[in-house]
């Protein structure tokens, strides 16, 4: 029998499309979690493995007890029965854990499962496993990322042969069976599999799926990979809808229960775009499991691996180069590394807390969901428990969501279980928090909660807390270490008393005035204050319903920083409520200690200089190209990337650090920006360069994404050059120059 090249066969497509066109995926309001259901007591689980050191068995069992998790998934293959995984399985069962045993043939054996020889090996393996563990395990799963042939190795014929043998053996012993560990949300495979097994009268007891949403970055997002970005909001395939649809598919084919036997966020993938990967993994874990608990669809949900430096709850101390060739979601073969190097990630405490808070809880309903703000109401242990968070980078003041009386009566717990005792939080942000009240207390909301005025923060900025300010018609935010510093800062930088310096004493005085003041918290430092002083009439009309310039500057800087793009650290912003002039707002940030800006560097190169301050042309081009490419890859369209806004700190002649200022116009995406926006930024950045220099610079930039400079790439540069030429001659600058020339002539 020839081996099939892919699991996505014509029959899979036909079965799936027939189901979809028949309305199988129709689920009105399926993206919203249904109210009033109970989260199973044994809802939470994790994948485990051990190694040759039996002390690892003891360690992992101890960590599972700390987590409060009794449900584990363990992978077994042919050689494991006489190895450490078999020993570890016995230890888990003796310790009272409910084990889901995933049986996995070696890759080459799975590829040849259609042959009589391999079927005999598989049958012997099944019989041995069931004789040794069968009566003690909770359930057995057959299939490992079945729809990923390069990981599992199966053909459909081979899998159905393996399933039939396992089905007959397990049915004789009354052992529940799971099938077939489909990876991600790819319902064509679920439909084809269950349709085929129903026809064979071999349906599993439980449908299993690895319900990953890592590809959408955040657990709450609508999946942009289903019919792409512009349709994501229309079809609303978020995590809740995916879970509900998987349950529906199972029930349509006669299976009542569905489980997710593995999912995670790999830290290294998070850090491709965001800072603080381990902290973000912990955020995502809490948000993911809360949404699955709210969906009311899954019988169980497992985190992929307990011990792994990439995706585990515990860091094994290894480097990426030491990661096994086969993905651990396909086969978690062993806990690698040395026991003395194991260290819990923040996600460990996050898992411990969500297990404690939500196991067996009653889900009351969603107070806010799918709009960037998530608040979910549970009853647990005689308490109202609200799990609250915002999407990445966004924040909303608690006072805009709950009444003062409700907040005064609340107890607050961090994502990791620590109590907020001395200083309660001011904001709901991307890091989930738990708010609890006694069961009889009436929780009152200010209004229907939502993200109204845009507010961005870098939630994991070290040694930083955010305090919302409301003071005599002013509002804003300060970023300091504690409440005492916030009060000290407000005394020194009261917006009612902040006054800009005159033109001669300012760093800049044009549409905005920028000046320095002593840092209220550090007498040895200066900070920068920025305030609009001139608004053209059309801007007053167009910007009336936009956030203030100070808020936009704050948001832009915060979005850059959390993406790993340097900008002077924001300290505060203040805005006058109801200000029609649009000029009564202040943005305050650290003063940037730099050596020059790119406008000066490129100006020198354009004048024919071979170097500037000891910097060679190619060094500057290559390093600036990497900086801007990273910014674009991480989702920033800066829109004002002129040379004066790119600051340069010279570490040495071959090592430069760049940072960005004037951040109010920047726009941000969760994904890399398209080429036309990249070119729009680049036209401003290298406007001063002549075309030979531009070609060198653009060669570096485009080469980072495997491209070469083409003719159509040059068009935006010609258009921008023309725009600048016209602006200098017939625009505001041209008119100003003409007026000055006429004045001097007649005087």
Over which residues does each language-model region extend?
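Catalytic domains of carbohydrate-active enzymes, especially glycoside hydrolases
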Residues: 41-81, 87-91, 98-102
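Conserved ATP-binding subdomain of kinase catalytic cores across diverse folds
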Residues: 469, 474-599, 610, 626-634, ...
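Hydrophobic residue at the +6 position relative to the catalytic HRD Asp in the kinase catalytic loop
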Residues: 641, 646-651
């Amino acid at each position: 029998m020839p081996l099939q090249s892919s699991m996505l066969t014509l029959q899979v497509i036909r079965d799936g499309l027939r189901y979809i066109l028949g309305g199988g995926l129709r689920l009105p309001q399926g993206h919203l979690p249904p109210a009033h259901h109970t989260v199973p007591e044994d809802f939470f689980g994790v994948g485990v493995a051990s190694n040759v050191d039996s002390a690892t068995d003891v360690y992992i069992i101890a960590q599972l007890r700390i987590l409060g998790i009794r449900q584990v998934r363990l992978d077994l293959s042919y050689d494991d029965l006489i190895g450490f995984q078999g020993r570890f399985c016995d230890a888990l069962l003796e310790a009272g854990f409910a084990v889901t045993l995933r049986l996995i043939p070696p890759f080459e054996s799975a590829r040849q499962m259609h042959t009589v020889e391999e079927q005999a090996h598989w049958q012997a393996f099944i019989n041995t496993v069931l004789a040794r563990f069968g009566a003690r395990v909770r359930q057995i799963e057959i299939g490992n990322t079945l729809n990923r042939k390069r990981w599992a190795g199966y053909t459909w014929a081979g899998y159905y042969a393996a399933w039939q043998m396992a089905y007959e053996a397990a049915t004789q012993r009354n052992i529940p069976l799971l099938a077939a560990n489909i990876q991600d949300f790819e319902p064509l495979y679920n439909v084809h599999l269950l349709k085929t097994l129903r026809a064979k009268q071999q349906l599993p007891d439980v449908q299993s799926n690895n319900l990953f949403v890592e590809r959408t970055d955040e657990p709450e997002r609508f999946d942009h990979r289903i019919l792409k970005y512009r349709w994501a909001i229309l079809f609303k395939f978020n995590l809740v809808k995916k879970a509900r649809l998987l349950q529906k598919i199972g029930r349509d084919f006669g299976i009542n229960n569905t489980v997710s036997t593995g999912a995670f966020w790999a830290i290294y993938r998070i850090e491709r775009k965001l800072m603080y990967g381990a902290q973000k993994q912990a955020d995502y874990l809490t948000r993911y499991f809360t949404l699955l608990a709210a969906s009311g669809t899954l019988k169980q949900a497992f985190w992929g691996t307990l011990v792994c430096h990439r995706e585990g709850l515990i860091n094994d101390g290894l480097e990426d180069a030491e990661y096994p060739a086969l993905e651990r979601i396909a086969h978690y073969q062993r806990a690698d590394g040395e026991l003395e190097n194991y260290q819990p990630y923040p996600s460990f405490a996050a898992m411990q807390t969500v297990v404690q808070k939500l196991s067996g809880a009653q889900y009351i309903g969603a107070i806010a969901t799918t709009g960037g703000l998530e608040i979910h109401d549970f009853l647990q242990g005689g308490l109202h428990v609200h799990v609250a968070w915002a999407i990445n980078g966004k924040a909303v003041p608690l006072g805009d969501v709950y009444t003062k009386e409700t907040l005064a009566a609340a107890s607050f717990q961090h994502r990791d279980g620590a109590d907020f005792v001395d200083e309660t939080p001011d904001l709901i942000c991307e890091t989930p928090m738990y708010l609890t009240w006694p069961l009889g207390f009436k929780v009152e909301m200010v209004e229907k909660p939502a993200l109204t005025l845009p507010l961005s923060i870098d939630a994991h900025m070290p040694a930083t807390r955010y305090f919302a300010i409301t003071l005599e018609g002013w509002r804003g935010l300060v970023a300091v270490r504690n409440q005492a510093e916030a009060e000290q800062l407000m005394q020194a930088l009261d917006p009612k008393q902040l006054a800009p310096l005159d033109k001669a004493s300012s760093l800049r005085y044009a549409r905005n005035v920028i000046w320095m003041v002593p840092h209220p918290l550090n007498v040895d430092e200066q900070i920068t204050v920025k305030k609009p002083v001139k608004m053209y009439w059309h801007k007053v009309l167009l910007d009336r319903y936009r956030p203030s310039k100070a808020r936009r500057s704050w948001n832009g800087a915060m979005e850059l920083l959390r993406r790993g793009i340097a900008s002077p650290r924001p300290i505060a912003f203040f805005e006058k409520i109801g200000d029609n002039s649009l000029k009564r707002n202040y943005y305050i940030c650290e003063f940037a200690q730099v050596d020059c800006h790119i406008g000066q560097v490129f100006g020198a190169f354009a004048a024919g200089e071979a170097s500037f301050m000891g910097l060679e042309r190619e060094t500057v081009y290559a390093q600036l190209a990497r900086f801007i490419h990273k910014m674009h890859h991480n989702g920033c369209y800066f829109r004002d990337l002129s040379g004066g806004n790119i600051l340069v700190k010279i570490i040495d002649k071959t090592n430069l650090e760049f940072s960005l200022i004037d951040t109010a116009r920047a726009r941000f995406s969760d994904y890399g920006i398209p080429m036309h926006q990249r070119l729009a930024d680049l036209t401003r950045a290298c406007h001063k360069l002549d075309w030979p220099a531009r070609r060198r610079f653009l060669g570096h930039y485009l080469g980072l994404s495997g491209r070469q400079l083409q003719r159509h790439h040059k068009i935006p540069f010609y258009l921008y050059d023309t725009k600048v030429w016209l602006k200098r001659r017939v625009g505001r600058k041209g008119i100003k120059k003409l007026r000055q020339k006429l004045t001097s002539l007649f005087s």
